[in-house]
Amino acid sequence: MHGIAVIELKGYREWTESLGPRREHIIQQIQAKLHATLWKSFTTVGALPHHFRYDFFIALVNNISSAAVESAVAKIARHSPVPIDFCIGTGDTPYSAYLNCRGKEVEATSFSIVAHMDIVNSTKTTKLNGPLDVYSHIVRLIDTLLDVCKEYGCLVFYLGGDNTALFLPTPDVINEIVRNIDTRVRVGVGVAKKPYNAFVKATRGLDYLRSTNREGIKIVK
């Protein structure tokens, strides 16, 4: 079973509106602090988070105790302008675990499988056409991946640049995902007990493909 934690900033929209129309610089600074705390607190316990919508955060929490998740959430709460709540869901896939997110005492024991994907030749394209061209490409790619992931049970998130992260149900699923997109990509896939270790392995696989100037998939177990 895979585990997903969803963290909610309750009353966040109302808080933003209370700041008045000259508020966006305040909101962005608060979001940056919460983002930094999210990554520090969750990766410290071995989980893999993402800022998601900023009023909601998400994390892969396979083999992370509910107590450790609660402790990470508490650290974020210290910097939040509104109360924070969370749930943990489990399922046969990361996507089903997300849909099942209700309780707080649930723990998942499956190995974590994470992919780190980038677009082939994005650096060259950026030099030729500027950063907006690659940015628009990655937005379209993520839109496609979101639809594909619903079918295969994965979750996808934008990391910045031309990089995306995917929480996968099995290592082999990445083959089907790549077949369903029309973009040349490199993908490192990591398998480990804890999610952040899986992501580190995925990045190692991606770095190997980059250093050898290859595209395709590299699985690191």
From Swiss-Prot:
Signal sequence bounds: none
Enzyme class, first EC level, given as a word: hydrolase
One term of GO molecular function: GTP cyclohydrolase IIa activity
Any one GO BP annotation for this protein: biosynthetic process
Classification via InterPro entries: GTP_CycHdrlase_3, Nucleotide_cyclase, Rev_trsase/Diguanyl_cyclase
Catalyzed reaction equations: GTP + 3 H2O = 2-amino-5-formylamino-6-(5-phospho-D-ribosylamino)pyrimidin-4(3H)-one + 2 phosphate + 2 H(+)
EC number annotated for this UniProt entry: 3.5.4.29
Entry keyword Nucleotide-binding: yes
Keywords, comma-separated and alphabetical: GTP-binding, Hydrolase, Nucleotide-binding
PANTHER family: GTP CYCLOHYDROLASE III (PTHR42202:SF1)
Known role: Catalyzes the formation of 2-amino-5-formylamino-6-ribofuranosylamino-4(3H)-pyrimidinone ribonucleotide monophosphate and inorganic phosphate from GTP. Also has an independent pyrophosphate phosphohydrolase activity.
HAMAP family: GTP_cyclohydro_3
Family: Belongs to the archaeal-type GTP cyclohydrolase family.
Protein name as it appears in the record: GTP cyclohydrolase III
